[in-house]
A protein has these predicted regions:
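ALDH superfamily catalytic-core signature
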Residues: 2-151, 173-181
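Short, surface-exposed loop/turn microsegments at beta-strand edges and helix-strand junctions
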Residues: 160-161
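Short, solvent-exposed loop/beta-turn-alpha elements that line the ligand-binding surface or hinge
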Residues: 157
Protein backbone atom coordinates (compact mmCIF):
# COMPACT_ATOMS: atom_id res chain seq x y z
CA UNK A 1 0.00 0.00 0.00
CA UNK A 2 1.07 3.60 -0.44
CA UNK A 3 1.23 4.35 3.32
CA UNK A 4 3.53 1.37 3.88
CA UNK A 5 5.71 2.35 0.92
CA UNK A 6 6.01 5.88 2.34
CA UNK A 7 6.97 4.46 5.74
CA UNK A 8 9.63 2.21 4.20
CA UNK A 9 10.97 5.05 2.07
CA UNK A 10 11.07 7.56 4.94
CA UNK A 11 12.66 5.10 7.35
CA UNK A 12 15.27 3.97 4.84
CA UNK A 13 16.22 7.40 3.51
CA UNK A 14 16.46 8.85 7.04
CA UNK A 15 19.48 6.58 7.56
CA UNK A 16 21.11 7.67 4.31
CA UNK A 17 20.13 4.59 2.33
CA UNK A 18 18.86 4.63 -1.24
CA UNK A 19 15.31 3.28 -1.33
CA UNK A 20 12.85 2.44 -4.06
CA UNK A 21 9.44 1.39 -2.73
CA UNK A 22 6.55 0.39 -4.96
CA UNK A 23 3.35 0.77 -2.98
CA UNK A 24 0.85 -0.73 -5.36
CA UNK A 25 0.70 -2.93 -8.38
CA UNK A 26 -1.66 -3.82 -11.18
CA UNK A 27 -0.05 -6.82 -12.81
CA UNK A 28 -1.20 -7.75 -16.30
CA UNK A 29 -1.10 -10.98 -18.30
CA UNK A 30 -1.32 -10.54 -22.06
CA UNK A 31 -2.87 -13.52 -23.85
CA UNK A 32 -2.03 -13.59 -27.55
CA UNK A 33 -4.16 -15.29 -30.25
CA UNK A 34 -1.66 -18.14 -30.58
CA UNK A 35 -1.56 -18.84 -26.82
CA UNK A 36 -2.45 -22.21 -25.37
CA UNK A 37 -5.67 -21.10 -23.65
CA UNK A 38 -5.79 -24.08 -21.30
CA UNK A 39 -2.30 -23.23 -20.08
CA UNK A 40 -3.13 -19.51 -19.84
CA UNK A 41 -6.31 -20.27 -17.90
CA UNK A 42 -4.51 -22.51 -15.43
CA UNK A 43 -1.76 -19.91 -14.98
CA UNK A 44 -4.35 -17.19 -14.38
CA UNK A 45 -6.16 -19.26 -11.78
CA UNK A 46 -3.07 -19.52 -9.62
CA UNK A 47 -1.79 -16.03 -10.35
CA UNK A 48 -5.09 -14.25 -9.72
CA UNK A 49 -6.65 -16.31 -6.94
CA UNK A 50 -3.69 -17.82 -5.08
CA UNK A 51 -3.40 -16.39 -1.55
CA UNK A 52 -6.93 -15.00 -2.08
CA UNK A 53 -5.37 -12.41 -4.39
CA UNK A 54 -3.69 -10.81 -1.36
CA UNK A 55 -0.17 -10.67 -2.71
CA UNK A 56 1.70 -7.92 -4.44
CA UNK A 57 2.50 -9.93 -7.54
CA UNK A 58 -1.00 -11.29 -8.15
CA UNK A 59 -2.23 -10.98 -11.73
CA UNK A 60 -5.31 -8.81 -11.48
CA UNK A 61 -5.75 -7.92 -15.17
CA UNK A 62 -6.01 -10.37 -18.06
CA UNK A 63 -5.49 -8.72 -21.45
CA UNK A 64 -6.63 -11.08 -24.21
CA UNK A 65 -5.78 -9.89 -27.70
CA UNK A 66 -8.91 -9.99 -29.93
CA UNK A 67 -12.50 -10.52 -28.88
CA UNK A 68 -12.32 -14.14 -30.04
CA UNK A 69 -9.53 -14.87 -27.54
CA UNK A 70 -11.32 -12.88 -24.82
CA UNK A 71 -14.57 -14.79 -25.29
CA UNK A 72 -12.78 -18.15 -25.23
CA UNK A 73 -10.72 -17.18 -22.17
CA UNK A 74 -13.75 -16.02 -20.18
CA UNK A 75 -15.59 -19.21 -21.15
CA UNK A 76 -12.70 -21.31 -19.79
CA UNK A 77 -12.27 -19.24 -16.62
CA UNK A 78 -15.90 -19.24 -15.46
CA UNK A 79 -16.25 -22.92 -14.47
CA UNK A 80 -12.81 -22.94 -12.84
CA UNK A 81 -13.56 -19.86 -10.74
CA UNK A 82 -17.00 -21.15 -9.79
CA UNK A 83 -15.45 -24.47 -8.73
CA UNK A 84 -12.87 -22.91 -6.37
CA UNK A 85 -13.31 -24.41 -2.92
CA UNK A 86 -13.22 -21.60 -0.39
CA UNK A 87 -12.50 -22.54 3.21
CA UNK A 88 -10.34 -22.32 6.31
CA UNK A 89 -6.76 -23.56 6.47
CA UNK A 90 -7.86 -26.57 8.54
CA UNK A 91 -9.74 -27.87 5.49
CA UNK A 92 -7.08 -29.65 3.41
CA UNK A 93 -9.29 -29.50 0.32
CA UNK A 94 -9.72 -25.70 0.47
CA UNK A 95 -8.13 -23.94 -2.49
CA UNK A 96 -8.54 -20.38 -1.21
CA UNK A 97 -8.81 -19.04 2.32
CA UNK A 98 -10.37 -15.93 3.83
CA UNK A 99 -9.27 -12.34 3.48
CA UNK A 100 -7.21 -10.92 6.33
CA UNK A 101 -9.76 -8.60 8.03
CA UNK A 102 -13.41 -7.60 7.90
CA UNK A 103 -12.32 -4.13 6.78
CA UNK A 104 -10.47 -5.61 3.83
CA UNK A 105 -13.46 -7.82 2.95
CA UNK A 106 -15.60 -4.66 2.89
CA UNK A 107 -13.01 -2.92 0.69
CA UNK A 108 -12.92 -5.79 -1.82
CA UNK A 109 -16.73 -6.09 -1.98
CA UNK A 110 -16.87 -2.31 -2.38
CA UNK A 111 -14.64 -2.54 -5.44
CA UNK A 112 -16.89 -5.24 -6.88
CA UNK A 113 -19.88 -2.94 -6.34
CA UNK A 114 -17.98 -0.09 -8.05
CA UNK A 115 -17.11 -2.29 -11.02
CA UNK A 116 -20.76 -3.15 -11.53
CA UNK A 117 -21.82 0.49 -11.11
CA UNK A 118 -19.19 1.65 -13.61
CA UNK A 119 -20.47 -0.75 -16.28
CA UNK A 120 -18.08 -3.71 -16.18
CA UNK A 121 -19.76 -7.07 -16.73
CA UNK A 122 -19.62 -9.16 -13.53
CA UNK A 123 -19.39 -12.69 -14.94
CA UNK A 124 -18.63 -14.50 -11.66
CA UNK A 125 -19.68 -12.91 -8.36
CA UNK A 126 -17.82 -14.21 -5.32
CA UNK A 127 -19.43 -11.89 -2.77
CA UNK A 128 -21.85 -14.38 -1.21
CA UNK A 129 -19.54 -17.38 -1.01
CA UNK A 130 -19.81 -19.56 2.09
CA UNK A 131 -16.85 -21.42 3.59
CA UNK A 132 -16.41 -25.14 2.98
CA UNK A 133 -16.72 -26.12 6.66
CA UNK A 134 -19.29 -25.51 9.37
CA UNK A 135 -18.19 -23.25 12.20
CA UNK A 136 -16.36 -20.70 10.04
CA UNK A 137 -19.34 -18.67 8.84
CA UNK A 138 -18.03 -15.53 10.56
CA UNK A 139 -14.74 -15.63 8.65
CA UNK A 140 -13.86 -13.11 5.98
CA UNK A 141 -14.56 -15.42 3.05
CA UNK A 142 -15.15 -14.29 -0.50
CA UNK A 143 -15.04 -16.33 -3.67
CA UNK A 144 -13.24 -15.47 -6.85
CA UNK A 145 -14.86 -12.78 -8.98
CA UNK A 146 -14.44 -12.19 -12.70
CA UNK A 147 -15.18 -8.99 -14.58
CA UNK A 148 -15.27 -8.69 -18.37
CA UNK A 149 -15.30 -5.58 -20.55
CA UNK A 150 -13.29 -3.57 -18.06
CA UNK A 151 -11.91 -0.28 -19.35
CA UNK A 152 -8.90 1.64 -18.13
CA UNK A 153 -11.02 4.50 -16.76
CA UNK A 154 -12.76 2.20 -14.23
CA UNK A 155 -11.72 2.11 -10.57
CA UNK A 156 -11.29 -1.68 -10.68
CA UNK A 157 -8.67 -1.16 -13.39
CA UNK A 158 -6.90 1.80 -11.81
CA UNK A 159 -6.75 0.67 -8.19
CA UNK A 160 -5.06 -2.32 -6.62
CA UNK A 161 -7.92 -4.38 -5.17
CA UNK A 162 -5.63 -6.84 -3.35
CA UNK A 163 -8.25 -9.56 -3.40
CA UNK A 164 -9.59 -12.39 -5.58
CA UNK A 165 -10.92 -10.21 -8.39
CA UNK A 166 -9.77 -10.68 -11.99
CA UNK A 167 -10.53 -8.04 -14.62
CA UNK A 168 -10.55 -8.79 -18.34
CA UNK A 169 -9.54 -5.82 -20.49
CA UNK A 170 -9.93 -6.61 -24.18
CA UNK A 171 -7.27 -5.45 -26.62
CA UNK A 172 -7.57 -5.57 -30.39
CA UNK A 173 -3.86 -6.00 -31.10
CA UNK A 174 -0.50 -6.51 -29.43
CA UNK A 175 0.42 -2.81 -29.40
CA UNK A 176 -2.80 -1.77 -27.65
CA UNK A 177 -2.24 -4.57 -25.10
CA UNK A 178 1.28 -3.33 -24.39
CA UNK A 179 0.00 0.25 -24.07
CA UNK A 180 -2.12 -0.90 -21.13
CA UNK A 181 0.94 -2.10 -19.29
Amino acid sequence: STPIARYIYTTGTSTGKRVQALGGAKNHMVIMPDADLDMATNALMGAAFGSAGERCMAISVAVPVTDKVADALVEKLVPKIEALKIGPSVDPSAEMGPLITSEHLNKVTGYIDEGVNEGAKLVVDGRNTKPSMQGYENGYFIGGSLFDNVTKDMSIYKNEIFGPVLSVVRAQDYNSAVDLI
